[in-house]
Amino acid sequence: MATRASTSSRVSPAFTFLVIFFLLSLTASVEAAGRGVNNDKKGGGLGASFIFGDSLVDAGNNNYLSTLSRANMKPNGIDFKASGGTPTGRFTNGRTIGDIVGEELGSANYAIPFLAPDAKGKALLAGVNYASGGGGIMNATGRIFVNRLGMDVQVDFFNTTRKQFDDLLGKEKAKDYIAKKSIFSITIGANDFLNNYLFPLLSVGTRFTQTPDDFIGDMLEHLRDQLTRLYQLDARKFVIGNVGPIGCIPYQKTINQLDENECVDLANKLANQYNVRLKSLLEELNKKLPGAMFVHANVYDLVMELITNYDKYGFKSATKACCGNGGQYAGIIPCGPTSSLCEERDKYVFWDPYHPSEAANVIIAKQLLYGDVKVISPVNLSKLRDM
């Protein structure tokens, strides 16, 4: 199925307030569970996976925040084997891309959420997840959700973890473990467009005073500082995902009343503008920061391939949310106990109005792990681990 662009940008405030109202009415009380991977991979395993980002890789940090952005209610996590199907705060039906990558690279456990009460001692050695639903590169991003962890805060939290590693291993061993045996994964940027620059009501002032190029420039300057701070804390192996085709998610297609084979042109154009400049930034950092490897993950093309040729990968739908309500694509109300739920969860590219299903995450993760330079460069993640 070919996907054509639409210049539509009809975003109704009524839809926005409906989403907020529904989120406020959700009362979730299921505690996160399931840290173990039960990994049987032999030798050469990843030491620690440090995961930064937004709801695409949040493993439960938002469970511990007073926020409108939460996923610790059923049927989220229904296919997450480590918890027996109990919701953990992941915004999908099963594993995130971060989970799958860590598992495939031989990590002993899933990276533990930084805010979890048991995130201490030896539990940190498999890695820590700092990602937060609603978080972005810019501090103002996601304020509609009340609370979230932006990238600046996430880096601050890693600074705390870094000191804990010194206490656990001693300074010399800790530095070696973090620099040589760990991977730093950053999946962020989509919210800076969806829940900042493009968000109705909140973004009017920003869009009036800043051109898209200026806003993207600010994003990249902030990201440069954040990545440099991690480098100064001994991070050396990085993978940074670009922004996916955010104009094609069920939420955007629904609120803009698009046909099945249309996407919101403006959102995708902004993502592509950012992505081109992100790749240049990573190339620059590879030259400027000795001993570092910044890997660029071309998530945009990977996801667009699934959306455009979904049937080739065994999917039945790349437009409708498996779990959600409202509109043609179930794209208005987030996944929760009262949501409509599809019967074949592994046949949908999108789990909810915003996030991929585990089936889609597996395909994307495998490409990042073993794919060629078209999707992951200059090396894939299996090679990055062994460097």
Swiss-Prot record:
Its EC number is 3.1.1.-. Pfam families: Lipase_GDSL. Residues 1-32 form the signal peptide. One of its GO terms (molecular function) is hydrolase activity, acting on ester bonds. It is found in: Secreted. The keyword Hydrolase applies. Gene3D superfamilies: SGNH hydrolase. The active site is at S55 (nucleophile), D352, H355. The keyword Transmembrane does not apply. Glycans are attached at N139, N159, N380. GO terms for biological process: lipid catabolic process. One of its GO terms (cellular component) is extracellular region. Its main location: secreted. Keywords: Glycoprotein, Hydrolase, Lipid degradation, Lipid metabolism, Secreted, Signal. Belongs to the 'GDSL' lipolytic enzyme family. PANTHER family: GDSL ESTERASE_LIPASE (PTHR45648:SF1), GDSL LIPASE/ACYLHYDROLASE FAMILY PROTEIN (AFU_ORTHOLOGUE AFUA_4G14700) (PTHR45648). This is GDSL esterase/lipase At2g23540. It comes from Arabidopsis thaliana (Mouse-ear cress).
